[in-house]
Amino acid sequence: MESGIHIDSALAIDAHCHLSNSAFNSDRGRVFEGCKERGLVLVDSPVNPEELRTSLEFGSGRPGFYRTAGWEAARLDYGGAKEMAELIRASRHSLVGIGEVGLDRFWVRDRAKWDEQERVFRLFIGLADELDLPLVVHSRSAGSACIELLLSAGFRKVLMHAYDGSVGPALRAASEGFVFSIPPSIIRSEQKLKLVRTLPLGRLMLESDAPALGPVKGERNTPENCLLSASSIAEVKKIPLENVLSSAIKLSLEFFGSSLAAVST
């Protein structure tokens, strides 16, 4: 029996969460049912083979549960990344995007390792281009570097998830077609508030990044909290919440394209 919500009846789309993460092993089904009751569609983001298997198995027969697939940016293992890329190729018709992938200069501070990190990132940029899928990018403490690398590679179908950089590079990226998803940690982040003030509503999507980046630091986040992101955007921009929700859904459908309707969950 199907369990989930169809895209055309969604209240909101959580464009980036990690329901396949082990933090949800004990109650993944219950969390998803709670999202279903709230009218949420989820885009899961497995970043290793185990999570991808979990996502594919859990998503079977559940409308409203989609996925990208990528590689943890701080994990410097090119061989492992290539193996993950092969799994992604094999799962192409069950995916709506590649990611999250990217650069992380918060956890990887040794500059001698940055070239290897960029090598892995370029592998997945090439894969997204090959498979004609959009790219979801992790850029912790590396926002400007990620944007420059993507622009130099000529890749612009990009979602910058939980972007933590300055607004200047973000504005440039937005002008090139990049979009940005806002996590519920916005309620405790002046940087995220400034980003939302600066970027146009039509470049903003919602995300939870669950189990991370919740409203309370250190507590497990859940996908339902992407609605807190929507409320914060509405407050910052002084517009009705309904406007934020409808704009974010429209942009999510444009970004992920027909995959959200056609993908085999």
Question: Where do the protein language model's features map onto the residues?
Answer:
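Mid-domain alpha/beta scaffold segments of enzyme catalytic cores
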Residues: 1-265
